[in-house]
Amino acid sequence: EPPTLAAAEADKDVAVAMVSEPSQSTAAVTAVVTPLIRIHGSNTVGEKLAPVLIEAFLAQQGGAEFSWQQQNAEVERLLSFSDRGQHKQVQLHAHGSSTAFKDLLSNKADIGMSSRRVTADEVSKAQQTLGDLSKIGNEHIIALDGLAIIVNQNNPLKAISTEMLARIFSGEISRWSQLGGPELPIVLLARDNNSGTFDTFNSLVLKKYQKKLSDKAQRFESSTDLSLAVSQDEAAIGFIGLNYIAYNKALAISEGADTTPIYPTRFTVSTEDYALSRRLYLYTPTSASQLAKDFAQFAISEQGQELVEQTGLVSQNIRIEKVFPIEGAPASYNQYAQSGQRLSLNFRFNYGENDLDNKGKRDLERLIRFMEQNSGRRLVLMGFSDSVGAVAKNAELALRRAKAVERELVSRGIPVLAVESFGELLPVANNDTDAGRERNRRVEVWLI
């Protein structure tokens, strides 16, 4: 049974670092208290999601009267709350993803928040004191994040590549006529530097092509205001979270000439087929306290994932989507598209391996729970590969991975109707990059 907060109080080394939007409260901090948990790292995670998760988790444990106070820096907050008459605190610092690993290593944090995966160098530095942060017991994918690129409804443009986006927002392409549009200057609208939204765009688009945001871009502190500005200007283009598309047109995004442009929806972000999607993480050391481990487990639970949805991010709870035939796709693929539905998860693999990545291992458990509630339906697994190596070998590898997922399901009593391999066909990402190849190595899950 999970320990109570009172039991955790004995462990003074426990700490969590998170960043949040302060909730309304009149409570004042009158005493210096050692934080029960310290959560440090990503502003994208810390701004809204972390505070919501931590309050819900602590309330479940018996906490009440929550009050957030800003500390020395804007991104440093302290949560004060009461637990059975005792005053307790949680520390949340959101100075950026890299600080998650630095502060874990220097014992300034108990939990790290990150909007990117831990690097090999960070894993190596932390190995001796924190354990292997890349392993499933220490790495927790808590949400998915997607960015929509929006233009005015009257703009004829429908799709764009990430490279062209980088050239537009860096100012290299400055007129819509250069993209086959009207003879108008492109008006760039962007979120402010402190926003997780800009951080996402910067990492997935600008940095990818070694570009920087143009000085001519108008900056907004509010996604709502940015979206409204796009709707009022036929020459404008901007980027926002999925919840803020409003009256505008969202563009389909491709990663290159060989990939199909994909529109941003909660489904395409959930499957990670959409180019401007990314994973959000919590990291806990192997030696983390029971309370820290319980919090990470709560975040990835069905209840935690429902809270993810409420904050505007994309959860990993499974949803069903109707699929349509794709022009040029194999006939067998399109036959399934006519009669089946697709589930909002893809299983992905490390290069050259049949072993699921950490998200895949947890998604397997989610799929099993989903099928227990949909016991009359059957699954079809479709394997895909990157384009490195011979075509026949890639098709064989894609089949082997799909069969690896089948074995895991069948051994747990979940029936699989068919296993297919489409090899390197129908790529969702550019095979010229490591990240693109990783996204193409996937097993799609269909419901018949």
Specify the residue positions occupied by each region the protein language model found.
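Ligand-binding "clamshell"
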Residues: 122-138, 246-270
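Ligand-binding pocket segment of bilobal, Venus flytrap-like solute-binding proteins
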Residues: 72-84, 101, 110, 194-261
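N-terminal segment of the mature folded domain
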Residues: 19-169
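Extracytoplasmic ligand-binding site segments that recognize negatively charged/polar headgroups
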Residues: 48-50, 135-216, 221, 227-231
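Periplasmic-binding protein-like
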Residues: 162-181, 298-319
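A bilobed periplasmic-binding-protein/Venus flytrap-type ligand-binding module shared by bacterial periplasmic
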Residues: 147-155, 271-273, 277-289
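Periplasmic OmpA-like peptidoglycan-binding domain that tethers envelope proteins to the cell wall
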Residues: 99, 384-448
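Periplasmic peptidoglycan-binding/tethering modules of Gram-negative envelope proteins
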Residues: 305-310, 315-378
